[in-house]
C-alpha cells in the first residue's frame, strides 16, 4: 500500500509553485512541516480534490480521494451521549466492532473519561476524541493535524504514542507547523518553506544537514595536509563541507595555507524548521 504524490504541482501564489514527487511506503509515517497553516489546509483539500492542482495523489495507483479519508473535525457526535456510547455507535456505521473494554482502555490512554458526555469536553479533549475515532476507523491513509493550538504538550505526547501503537500498516501523515519530538516519530519528513519544498527525506539526514557548512575555496590542493585532524567532504571541485562547530578553525587553517575562502554557506539555509528544534 503506497501513497504517492506523482508530479504534483500547485500554484500557491503568483510567483510560487509547490512541486511534490515522492512515495510513502506501507506503514511509513510522514511528517509535513509548513510554516503556514493555510498551505496545510490546501494539502488537505488536495487529498480530497477540493482544490485544483496538476499531477496526481495516488494510493495503490488509484486516486487517493477514493479512500475513506476522515479528518479530525469531519465527523459529528451526539452531545448527550457518553464518549463510550458515541464511539460504539459511530464505529458500527463502519462495520467495525471493538469491545467495550478495549474502547475504555483507548479512551483512558488519551486521558479521556469514557463516561463523560461529548458536550462537556474541553476543546483539546474534542480534538483527541476525534483523532481516536479516525484511528479506530482503520483507514489506509491516516492524516493527523497537529496544528490545533488547543492541544497541550501532554496531549501531543499521548497522541504520538497512540499512533505508534494503533496505526497498524496505515500510511500516516502528520501535519504541523514546527518540528518537535511529538511529530519526529516519522520515518520521513517533508519541509515546505513559504510554499516551496525545501527538504524531503529521513529526519536524521535533515538534522545532520542543518549542522553542515559549505566553504567555497580557491583550490583543493594539499587539503589532506592542510585540514589534518578535521573531518571534511569535497562537495564540488572547489567546495568542501565541514561541521558548523569547526568552521572558524577550518577557515583559519585554509587562509594560513594561502587557500582563499570565497563563500561560506549553511547547507540547510533554505530549510526552516521554525520553532521547537531544541525539543528534539
Residue positions per predicted region:
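Q-loop/switch helix immediately C-terminal to the Walker
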Residues: 74-102
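Conserved ABC transporter NBD signature motif
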Residues: 48, 52-66
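Conserved ABC ATPase "signature" C-loop
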Residues: 194-195
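Conserved ABC nucleotide-binding domain
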Residues: 100-125, 138
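C-terminal coupling/interaction segments
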Residues: 244-280
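Glycine-rich P-loop/Walker A and Walker A-like loops and their local beta1-loop-alpha1 context
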Residues: 27-50
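Hydrophobic anchor residue at the start of the ABC signature
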Residues: 131-132
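Conserved catalytic loops of ABC-family nucleotide-binding domains
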Residues: 161-178
